[in-house]
UniProtKB/Swiss-Prot annotation:
Its EC number is 2.7.2.11. SUPFAM superfamilies: Carbamate kinase-like. One of its GO terms (biological process) is L-proline biosynthetic process. ATP binds at residues 15, 178-179, 220-226. This is Glutamate 5-kinase.
């Protein structure tokens, strides 16, 4: 069993999913966002370098427009993302300001991190912001992202985006907050006897088999996308934790070594 004390992690990427930001009734969960901002501000005050990868643009757009179901058409999704992203950043800036924490926005597309020159520029931007103790709030630039045969600009989901960012900035730790307590041996929403897997050192068929399923009606990511992201972290020798984001201050407990969620690391 790996030592769970993660206090040595200096550079941390936190990914929060739509389900942690939007209530089941479609309303924005301001209480959770406030707790998240309080927690991440506290980490910066402890001399941690923190990057927040935040989903939720489409979900906030849905709430803003009074809609309850994510549309299937790409133009509608991108229009909602345009509405929701600006509102989401306004909420983040207001909440972080309550704790005297400065923030910034970085909207990425896949090709930005594919081409060496643009990749170097954006990673330099991350490093400068972290040096200034500013928290970058990262999302995919959903309004322009496409996924075509000859031109891919979409990451597909923010679980993978968070892993790409963690890799690019050489983070020590990735924390993915979701609507589930961690990785289970089978879907806990369907099976009452499902057991939490507390530690994973290799992504094999057994793990990928346990990770079947899709995301919430407001988001895109399911467990399979999270496992893909965790596989990258393990292969790069980085640590990652998958935990429930219902109470974002759980991050403090994770760093202090409490047995929460699933820890992914190289053996």
């Amino acid at each position: 069993m790996e030592n769970r004390n993660l206090q040595d992690a200096k550079r941390i990427v936190v990914k929060v999913g739509t389900s942690s930001l939007i209530r089941a009734n479609g309303k924005i969960n301001l209480q959770a966002i406030d707790e998240l901002c309080y927690t991440l501000s506290g980490l910066v005050n402890e001399d941690k370098e923190v990057v927040l990868v935040s989903s939720g643009a489409v979900g906030v757009g849905l709430a803003n427009m009074g809609l309850v179901q994510r549309p299937k058409q790409i133009p509608e999704q991108q229009a909602l993302a345009a509405i929701g992203q600006s509102q989401l950043m306004t909420i983040y800036q207001q909440r972080f300001a309550m704790y005297s924490q400065k923030t910034s926005q970085i909207l990425l597309t896949h090709d930005v991190l594919t081409y060496p020159e643009s990749r170097e520029n954006v990673l330099n931007t991350f490093n400068e912001l972290l040096k200034w103790k500013v928290i970058p709030v990262v999302n995919e630039n959903d309004t322009v992202a496409v996924d075509e045969m000859d031109h891919q600009t979409s990451f597909g989901d923010n679980d993978w985006l968070s892993a790409v960012v963690a890799s690019g900035i050489d983070a020590d730790l990735l924390i993915v907050l979701s609507d589930i307590d961690g990785l289970f041996n089978k879907n806990p929403k369907k099976y009452a006897d499902a057991n939490l897997i507390s530690e994973v050192t290799e992504i094999n068929e057994k793990i990928t088999g346990a990770a079947g399923g899709t995301g919430s009606r407001f988001g895109t990511g399911g467990m399979a996308t999270k496992i893909k992201a965790m596989d990258r972290m393990i292969n790069e020798g980085r640590k990652a934790v998958l935990a429930n984001g219902k109470r974002p201050s759980i991050i403090f407990e994770i760093l202090n070594g409490k047995q929460i969620g699933t820890l992914f690391h190289k053996k």
